[in-house]
Amino acid sequence: MNLDQYLPVLLFILVGVGVGILPMVLGRLLGPVRPDSEKNSPYECGFEAFEDARMKFDVRYYLVAILFILFDLEIAFLFPWAVSLKEIGALGFWSVMVFLGILVVGFVYEWKKGALDWE
């Protein structure tokens, strides 16, 4: 086995790691170091930092996040299906239609239950 073939890959990895680490090292070595309480305090979009990091969130945020992930995964399943639609034939087409039907029924159920209402 000839290891000379892997030299470009090794060089590519070394250059990539160097590009990632070199700016951090240069910033640490060349940057000014004058810490004070103002610089060390957390900054949150122009507002004063909250006292407690454990803020209570409304459950609807989590519900929207879960629904987003669910329908995002649906798109992830539909893309390979659309690419290979010619090869999979009628059985593949109808199996995806059943999959979409189940998702549509779930979406209508969520809509009727008020999961998408923000009031």
Curated annotation (Swiss-Prot):
Predominant cellular place of this UniProt entry's protein: membrane
Chain ranges passing through the membrane: 7-27, 63-83, 88-108
Catalytic activity: a quinone + NADH + 5 H(+)(in) = a quinol + NAD(+) + 4 H(+)(out)
Top-level taxon: Bacteria
Keyword Membrane recorded: yes
Record localization: Cell inner membrane
Enzyme Commission number(s): 7.1.1.-
Keywords of this entry: Cell inner membrane, Cell membrane, Membrane, NAD, Quinone, Translocase, Transmembrane, Transmembrane helix, Transport, Ubiquinone
A molecular function GO annotation: quinone binding
InterPro entries: NAD(P)H_OxRDtase_bac/plastid, NADH_UbQ/plastoQ_OxRdtase_su3, NDAH_ubi_oxred_su3_sf
Keyword Hydrolase attributed: no
Pfam families: Oxidored_q4
Cellular-component GO terms for this entry: NADH dehydrogenase complex; plasma membrane
Membrane topology listed for this record: Multi-pass membrane protein
Assembly with partners or alone: NDH-1 is composed of 14 different subunits. Subunits NuoA, H, J, K, L, M, N constitute the membrane sector of the complex.
Protein function: NDH-1 shuttles electrons from NADH, via FMN and iron-sulfur (Fe-S) centers, to quinones in the respiratory chain. The immediate electron acceptor for the enzyme in this species is believed to be ubiquinone. Couples the redox reaction to proton translocation (for every two electrons transferred, four hydrogen ions are translocated across the cytoplasmic membrane), and thus conserves the redox energy in a proton gradient.
HAMAP family linked to this entry: NDH1_NuoA
Family label: Belongs to the complex I subunit 3 family.
Designated name of the protein: NADH-quinone oxidoreductase subunit A
Lineage: Bacteria, Pseudomonadati, Pseudomonadota, Betaproteobacteria, Burkholderiales
Encoding gene (name): nuoA
